[in-house]
Amino acid sequence: MNDEKQMDRVQKIPITKLIPFKDHPFRVVEDESMLRTTESISMFGVLTPLIARPTEDGKFEIISGHRRAHAAEAVGLTEVPVIVRPMDDDVAKILVVDSNLQRENILPSERAFAYKMKAEAMKHQGERTDLQQGGTSVQVAPKLTTALIGEKDGVSKDTVKRFIRLTNLIPEILEMVDQNKIAFNPAVELSYLKPEEQKKLLEAIDFTQATPSVSQAMRLKKLSQEGGCKLEDMCEILAEVKKGDLERVAFKSEQLRKYFPKSYTPRQMSDVILKLLDQWQKKRQRDKAR
């Protein structure tokens, strides 16, 4: 008992002995919030202790305080206050998520993997999970796992499940969601596409210079479920004129294919078209100058 009390008190731990939590779903980035944290630690030091658990090799795995540790190292501190607390993997994962979801700005990908990590940890602890559709397991807790997560974070269980769907997106598309190039609702529908179809979708997005709306994403999902979503289908759907985008010029893939060798990819076709348009523009400018 005395050993547990000794471990749970605040200790000064060298930064060199701290390691990030494995599978940490949150990024440590140099944004405005990090700048404020760094400035505060530079002036006042680390006021709120980190929480870490001891490892077998004598180091300490950070559970809460990755950003504080990063900022402390950036300003030249060699040690930081840490509450050392032994805990199993499931408890650690839940604490990692709960301590980070309170941050100001959280990317969709961060929230998605955080919810997934917490749901899996709760499942391992014996909570019932309803993430698998069509499940027939007996409910062993008063609330479903996703409902418990949502209640803690102030969102519905359906919102939790939809965020977790985003973890099925390939990294390139998930990055577009984080950058607000693809909206959340279409992204959820796109998560049902197979990985190879998502890679084709990247080509279609690059070729048409358009991203799918919710209705377009739902159609792509339906095509995938009905036997496969081809690149040509994707290009044709994305090339459609959307509401609020009526001045955009769009072409169907078959209208362009006849002008190019069969081996040409959408990217190659796009490069040729832009090159020809550039030449045409220069010719018009020369004609006007005469």
Which residues make up each language-model segment?
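Amphipathic alpha-helical extensions and coiled-coil-like segments
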Residues: D153, K157-K275, Q279
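Amphipathic, charge-rich alpha-helical segments that serve as recognition/docking helices
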Residues: F26, L35, H70-N168, Y192
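Short, charged/polar connector segments at secondary-structure boundaries
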Residues: M1-R85, V91-N105, R267, R284
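Glutamine-centric residue-chemistry signal
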Residues: Q11, V46-T48, Q102, Q125, ...
